[in-house]
């Protein structure tokens, strides 16, 4: 579309199922271990329809176009997760918590507009180009380590707790938090014709080490 446009979608259906398990293990009088894991499948079950309007005058640019979303995964939702947490409760209100959290099998948020026939089929001049428009990118696995030191003070029936936390202990600055496909398309001139390619995926990075 050569103009700024808005989109309305209908008939979006997803299928979600999975399982999770947790365990709290007391290792010693002052130590315990928390474990958790989950596995699931979250995907689009049907192909929705999309109507695209020109922003300036509400002209319909594409009406009830099928968006080929079937079998795309729901974006930015980890389908595999794991967690382990150690807790130490020392004397006089001192304590330490250490946590490790992992998320895997994550995908970027797919674009409805990019998968319509007008975009993916008409502007893709080869099967390889069509694959560029419709392939859903998988995000890398994410691992974060957190540590917390705390001290509790007791006043009769009340308690005051002071905490010092370090998040993303490894200071991984390249860890991706989420991402989404751009609905926009690049037009590239080659010789006497044009080819079309999707714009790069937009990413949101996780915070570096924070206190």
Where are these regions (language model features)?
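C-terminal beta-barrel architecture of Gram-negative outer-membrane proteins
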Residues: 75-154, 178-179
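Gram-negative outer-membrane beta-barrel transporters
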Residues: 2-112
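Residues that define the transmembrane beta-barrel architecture of outer-membrane proteins
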Residues: 13-17, 76-82, 141-145, 158, ...
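Surface-exposed loop/turn segments flanking beta-strands in extracellular/periplasmic regions
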Residues: 1-7, 54-64, 117-126, 182-197
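C-terminal beta-signal and adjacent terminal beta-strands/loops
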Residues: 102-120, 151-211
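Intrinsically disordered, low-complexity acidic Ser/Thr-rich regulatory segments
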Residues: 62-76, 129-138, 197-208
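Asparagine-centered polar/low-complexity signal
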Residues: 9-10, 146, 168-171
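Outer-membrane beta-barrel proteins
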Residues: 24-29, 84, 88-94, 149-155, ...
């Amino acid at each position: 579309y050569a103009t700024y446009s808005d989109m309305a979608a209908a008939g979006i259906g997803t299928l979600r199922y999975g399982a999770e398990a947790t365990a709290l293990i007391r290792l010693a009088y002052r130590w315990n271990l928390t474990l958790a894991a989950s596995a699931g499948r979250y995907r689009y079950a049907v192909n929705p329809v999309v109507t695209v309007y020109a922003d300036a005058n509400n002209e319909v640019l594409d009406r009830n176009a099928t968006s080929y979303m079937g079998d795309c995964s729901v974006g930015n939702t980890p389908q595999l997760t794991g967690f382990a947490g150690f807790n130490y409760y020392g004397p006089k209100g001192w304590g330490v918590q250490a946590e490790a959290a992992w998320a895997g099998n994550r995908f970027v948020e797919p674009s409805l507009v990019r998968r319509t026939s007008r975009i993916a089929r008409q502007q893709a001049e080869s099967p390889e180009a069509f694959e560029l428009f419709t392939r859903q990118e998988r995000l890398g696995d994410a691992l974060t380590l957190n540590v917390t030191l705390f001290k509790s003070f007791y006043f009769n029936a009340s308690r005051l707790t002071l905490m010092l936390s370090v998040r993303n202990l490894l200071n991984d600055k390249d860890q991706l938090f989420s991402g989404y496909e751009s609905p926009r398309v690049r037009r590239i001139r080659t010789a006497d014709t044009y080819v079309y390619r999707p714009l790069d995926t937009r990413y949101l990075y996780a915070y570096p080490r924070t206190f």
